[in-house]
């Protein structure tokens, strides 16, 4: 059996993922939990990490590379930001060591856009960009990373020129649970209404100024003409994703389509949205991208 060379950790706000990686970059063991930054701040970051390392029988001196919210100001050790324009190679060079630990633990920095008119930050997504594009990426790329807070980044020659964050996932959660539209989606089952989703994407993309009105129409249409809770859910999702795409696709584009870094249900929804709008999109699995980015960092730090 192959021997682990390092552990790679993606530490989000509400989630934790760890992989034991061998010399060839293969995954030997995997751990997942809901012990994200919020939980780890209470339990102790070192204790949470050690519990997962113990569960996979990791050696006491096994090095660990971490990306995500463990490096936030409220996290374990603040890893700071690289300012745009930020070359992806800088991520490899500016990992921050965690002091006072028996093993070598490094946390990767985030990226900041210090523009008074469009301030923005990312932490964790930079590692996905690194894994998706590589440090030697040539040409122009527009990258969409869906999530609770979706990121759109414009990358030129391996340098993140600009990026923007959209609270699409969080808005979907709030709108569908905490507003009048919660009544429209009550008891929604798993059935999909692809046509409702596609129609909502197009309407929002073509008339983003009507965002608030389009959302209310989900409820009024159901009251006046009927429709299932599942269909209403798909309309809300399509509306919010359509609004995001209207902004993300605005302005100059690379000419080579969109690089979509996503997994699971989000990958399916965003790919359908791009196809509906006749926008070419190349899909890269988000989990593979973050793992590849962490591996690139480990190789640069420890010359694995």
PLM region spans:
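Short glycine-rich, Thr/Ser-proximal phosphate-binding strand/loop in the N-terminal lobe
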Residues: 6-44, 284
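A short acidic Gly-Thr/Ser loop motif
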Residues: 9-15, 69, 145-149, 168, ...
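Glycine-rich phosphate-binding loop plus the immediately following alpha-helix
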Residues: 40, 111-205
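Short beta-strand-loop/turn "lid" adjacent to the catalytic site in phosphate-handling enzymes
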Residues: 56-119, 157
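N-terminal phosphate-binding loop and adjacent alpha-helix
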Residues: 27-62, 71-78, 183-184
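Short acidic-glycine loop/turn motifs at beta-strand connectors
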Residues: 22-26, 101, 154-159
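ATP-binding/phosphotransfer module of carbohydrate and carboxylate kinases, centering on a glycine-rich
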Residues: 16, 23, 180-304
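Short glycine-rich phosphate-binding loop at a beta-alpha junction
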Residues: 61-72, 147, 241, 254-264
């Amino acid at each position: 059996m192959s021997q682990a060379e390092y552990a790679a950790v993606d530490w989000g706000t509400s989630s934790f993922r760890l992989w034991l990686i061998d010399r060839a970059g293969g995954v030997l063991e995997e751990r997942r939990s809901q012990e994200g930054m919020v939980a780890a701040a209470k339990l102790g970051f070192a204790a949470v990490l050690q519990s997962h390392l113990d569960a996979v029988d990791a050696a006491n001196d096994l090095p660990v590379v971490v990306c995500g919210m463990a490096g936030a100001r409220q996290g374990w050790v603040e890893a700071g930001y690289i300012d745009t324009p930020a070359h992806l190679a800088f991520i490899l060079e500016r990992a921050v060591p965690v002091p006072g630990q028996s093993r070598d633990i490094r946390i990767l920095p985030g990226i900041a856009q210090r523009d008074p008119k469009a301030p923005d930050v990312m932490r964790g997504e930079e590692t996905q960009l690194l894994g998706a594009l590589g440090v030697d990426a040539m040409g122009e790329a527009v990258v969409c990373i869906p999530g609770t807070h979706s990121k759109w980044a414009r990358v030129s020659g391996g340098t993140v020129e600009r990026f923007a964050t959209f609270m699409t996932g969080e808005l979907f959660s709030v709108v569908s649970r905490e507003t009048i539209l919660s009544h429209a989606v009550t008891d929604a089952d798993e059935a999909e209404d692809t046509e409702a989703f596609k129609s909502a994407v197009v309407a929002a993309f073509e008339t983003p100024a009507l965002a608030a009105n389009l959302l209310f129409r989900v409820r009024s249409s159901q009251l006046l003409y009927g429709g299932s809770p599942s269909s209403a859910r798909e309309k809300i999702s399509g509306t919010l994703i359509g609004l995001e795409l209207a902004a993300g696709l605005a302005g100059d584009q690379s000419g080579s389509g969109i690089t979509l870094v996503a997994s699971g249900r989000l990958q399916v929804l965003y790919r359908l949205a791009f196809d509906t709008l006749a926008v070419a999109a190349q899909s890269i699995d988000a989990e593979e991208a973050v793992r590849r980015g962490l591996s690139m960092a480990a190789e640069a730090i420890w010359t694995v």
